[in-house]
Amino acid sequence: MKNNRVTHIKLFSTNGAGVKNGKVASLNAEVQSTQSNIVTLQETHCTQKGKIKMDKTFVMFEAIRKRKGGGTLVAIHEDLNPKLIAEYDEEFELLVVEVDTADTSIRVISGYGPHKNWEEEKHLPFFIALETEIEKAELAGKSVLIELEANSKLGPNYISKDPHNITPNGTLLAGIIERHTLVVGNGSDRCVGTITRKKSNKK
């Protein structure tokens, strides 16, 4: 067991939209620059595990989509004693990894959820699995830190500057937030950022 006197965690998370070639070098540079000890990636597009290489002090966990696209990765510095709790990789990708700090244990959840244009019945399994893992963490007395590409827009009720209205996926996610009294980081005053990409869906 590594020294678990780690008192602070620093998270680096992004939707990679395909993490390969130059993006891997950029990822490692960002992690080193920010001194992050937890990394989550959504939409890795990897077809097999082990393609994304990071510093050997990180323990890597991946869920790979059976068909093209998707995928999620969690990388944890070894000093946080990471251990895999759950991995889903059938119709969607979800990883649950537990870490230990000096004061508490946290379950880091990373996932890539259903597209809004999927059939309605294909949306529910992802959100059911997500809520199940939150409930398991609560029963075990663990905190949760959740980073998702859930293809869910929560709207201005949760994120004050969100220019979008809540979507059906967002409604499912909002139900989980309310039932478990979760805090939406993007809606916090501490969260700042710039929109770097906009997509127009023409009818």
Model-assigned labels for residue ranges:
Residues 1-203:
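A shared catalytic/ligand-binding motif for oxyanion handling
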